[in-house]
Amino acid sequence: MTVSTGIWILIVVIGVLVGLTGGFFGARHYMQNYLKQNPPISEEMLRSMMMQMGQRPSEKKLHQMLNSMKAASKNDNK
């Protein structure tokens, strides 16, 4: 039972396309669930955290904290 080269190429191309499509949607689903469970911190969340700690949040202090958190996350990813 011999299968021609053209059919093998077609099977491989279809397999690659199915794998890429499945991988894309799998990664997309994973990231959506991850962001739902671990939302990125926003300025409002930071403001409410500072108020709960008894601090009066100024805009300058908020931006300093946001920038330091962004810098720390960049260093963690390296």
Swiss-Prot record:
Transmembrane segments: 5-27
Keyword DNA damage among UniProt keywords: no
Localization (cell): Membrane
Classification via InterPro entries: UPF0154
Domain of life the protein comes from: Bacteria
Gene Ontology terms: cellular component: plasma membrane
Keywords associated with the record: Membrane, Transmembrane, Transmembrane helix
Membrane topology: Single-pass membrane protein
Family: Belongs to the UPF0154 family.
Name recorded for this polypeptide: UPF0154 protein lp_2061
